[in-house]
Amino acid sequence: GPIGLAALEFLRLHDLKIIVMDMVESRLEFCRNHLGIEHTIPFSPDGSHLSELKEITGGELAEIVIDATGSVGSMSTCFEYAAFTGRVIYVGITTENLSFPHAPIFHRRELTLLASRNALPDDFGKIITLIADGEINTDIWITDRLSFEDVPTGFAAFTDTSRGTVKALIELP
């Protein structure tokens, strides 16, 4: 979604090894093809995604884990992906109660947990400048357009993850 894409765009402004994990292959493909992300990992319920992460990081896991899902399941397990003294950052929004079944990992690895939900007024000016200067390209996020008149019949198609919709735009008359 746009929160995860925004996080990726800001990470790309720095010289970092970026690894993206997702359950939907079309999203990983989008990251590879449009954002130039070299390392993408399909999440797997059997846990094989963790082995792939270890392979990419030389067994160290990730220094920074950003969870932009807003999914309680993802947020409660992302400690598993963080390296010793790593940081876990929540930028996704959830209204559900969040528990930490992996709290022993959190303590054992001496992790830092951060959360962010809002931007400050100064941030908006910086972001607008980055977009205007072409440092961040939000145009690629809009993969589908629909006229207002076609919303009743066409909107449901955007919920089909196999379409590869990143963001849909409804055009008003």
Cite the ranges covered by each PLM segment:
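Short conserved AdoMet
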Residues: 12, 57, 70, 83, ...
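Short loop/turn segments at beta->alpha junctions
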Residues: 45, 70, 147-150
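Mid-domain Rossmann-like dinucleotide-binding core that forms the NAD(H)/NADP(H) cofactor-binding site
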Residues: 1-46
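Short amphipathic alpha-helix with an adjacent loop that forms part of the alpha/beta core around
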Residues: 46-59
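C-terminal hydrophobic helical "lid"/dimerization subdomain
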Residues: 6, 76-79, 121-173
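Glycine-rich phosphate-binding loop and adjacent beta-alpha segment
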Residues: 16, 72-133, 172-173
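Short, acidic/turn-prone active-site loops that include or flank metal/cofactor-
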Residues: 24, 43-49, 93-96, 118-119
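Short SAM/SAH-binding signature in class I
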Residues: 60-66
